[in-house]
Amino acid sequence: MKKNRIYFGLLILALVVTIVWTSAGMLGVNKEEKKYSVSVIVNDSNNDRWIAMREGLEQAAKDDDIQLNYVSTGVFASEDEEKALIEREVENGADGIIVQLVSSEDTYAVFEKIDSSVAVMLLETDAVSEGVYSVTAPDNLWIGEALAQTVLQDYGDSLSEKKIGILSGNQNQLSMQQRLGSVKKLLEDENIEPVWILSGQGENLSSELVTKQADEPVDILITLGNAETETAVDSISSFAI
């Protein structure tokens, strides 16, 4: 499969340099002069997808004299694992938490034990924050629509003859649900239905992709996020397309 046949949603973390500044601002306008501590917790923190964000945060933290703790994580097995990490960082003195939640469901439960004085910023989550938390995320409906439009424009009338597969990422996250919904809607409007849709992440998704492509090969692969794109690229050598 050629790289130009892999369509992906490139996550652009707009204004990443302002994130730490915003977190500090949420700690109070008339705050005392002190060095604030902000912890960053994201899924699979050493993944290359986070390099640009991490560099931006570190530079912003340096500029604003903030102690930044970029927490080393693997792929979270559950929400409880992530919740325990958040609570640990707060217990260790974090004044603010920047976090990418594993799931967008019941976000209140994740933070119910966190003191209200701790600033929380949800990253790439699109959870309903009810005015309590600051949310920074891309327009996921637009991303899904743009992906589908790109495929439609590239293939035109011949698209009806092509078989499409989708790597939909972590469908426990509202952001990925929205991207998938937009892609499916535009394809359905053209009477096109994907041959298969795979969800999940990491090694499990990679092995499932290789198996699925062997059993039900597709001509076009749409991936909804950076991690899914990397999985697809890493698996190209196994594809016969």
Please place each PLM-identified region on the residue numbering:
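Hydrophobic membrane-insertion alpha-helices, especially the h-region
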Residues: 8-23
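Short beta-strand segments enriched in small/hydrophobic residues
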Residues: 26-53, 70, 133-134, 162-172
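Short, solvent-exposed amphipathic alpha-helices that sit
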Residues: 49-66, 143-150, 174-192, 231, ...
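Hydrophobic alpha-helical segments within soluble ligand-binding/sensing domains
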Residues: 136-161
